[in-house]
Amino acid sequence: MLFFRPSAHRAPQAKAFRFMSVCWLAASMLTLPLVGKAVAQEVNLYTVREPGLVKPLIVAFTAKTGIKVNTVFMNDGLAERVGAEGARSPADVMMTVDIAKLLEIVDKGLAQPVRSATLEAAVPAQLRDPDGRWFALSLRARLIYAAKDRVAAKPLTYEELADPQWKGRICIRSGQHPYNTALIAAYMAHHGEAATEVWMKGVKANLARKATGGDREVARDILGELCDIGLGNSYYVGLMRSGAGGPDQEKWGKAIRVVLPTFSNGGTHVNASGVALAKYAPNPAAAIQFMEFLVSDEGQRILAENNFEFPVKAGAPMHPLIAELGTLKPDSLPWAEIAKYRKAASLLVERIGFDQ
């Protein structure tokens, strides 16, 4: 009987072959997910903005880039939710309204810096964080609504609202509303707390009715001759005059003349909507691409068309109903400086009984 012993020199070859096969298989397994990610990019957006505004932006962005946007809509509590989710949060981009909300995101350490030549070229320096942790997208101005037939067509300042000539002629919503506490905080940043208290008491003395309702009700009461002037946001003018709120609101909007007031030592008070890149964004490159789209001409046009806000990008198209309001010259006071006075503004409203 013959016995065959395997050749000793073949064993190393077999081992080498098996080793190469395992390496090839491992490389293949690593490569497949990478290919999948390149083909199917996505962005996770958390926002408090209305679906009717956000969805056209998403459709246009996806059509342009092929990147899918998964959106979580919420009424409020964006910072609280992202903070609670921690490092496991799927959020890439956070979109919100009110500069105080953007600063809250930064203060809670929920955003990461973005360095983008596109964003920095489109958004003026005073409308973005110096470290790139948030960027404004659109602006709403705090305006004066005035009766066309009872108030002379001339420039006005916020300071003049305390002038006795307006006694019994001013309508305004609650002083505790964020629109007004932001304005009061800006006044404090310009003039100090003591001067602001004197001003607020003067405005209160000039009220035609209790500080209540909303900005559109200010226009309604001007039409009804309950008051002659009042404070309201710019986008409500477009909303009313467009007829989107119904025929009654269209009448209110067309009954007023709009004044772009300024501080005596500054510009028009504005607030903003804006975006930030989440600290633990799982898709940062695609997220930045989405943020850059939002400040492109197309993104700014969609924002303006659907929300009656002023674009942040110079020369970007705006809705005709907003363009006709005149040239906006935003106050240059840094928002971080204004934010320091938000609590003091609220306490002042309470202390003097402004809403009583």
Q: Where are the regions that the model predicts?
A:
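Extracellular/periplasmic juxtamembrane helices and adjacent flexible linkers that interface
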Residues: 293, 297-356
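A bilobed periplasmic-binding-protein/Venus flytrap-type ligand-binding module shared by bacterial periplasmic
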Residues: 143-150, 270-283, 302-303
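Early extracytoplasmic/lumenal segment of secretory-pathway proteins
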Residues: 41-103
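A structural signal for short loop-to-beta-strand junctions that line the ligand-binding cleft
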Residues: 89-94, 112-144, 159, 170-172
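Ligand-binding pocket segment of bilobal, Venus flytrap-like solute-binding proteins
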Residues: 186, 191-261
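Short beta-strand->loop
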Residues: 46-49, 112-120, 130-131, 134-135, 146-148, 153, 159, 247-269, ...
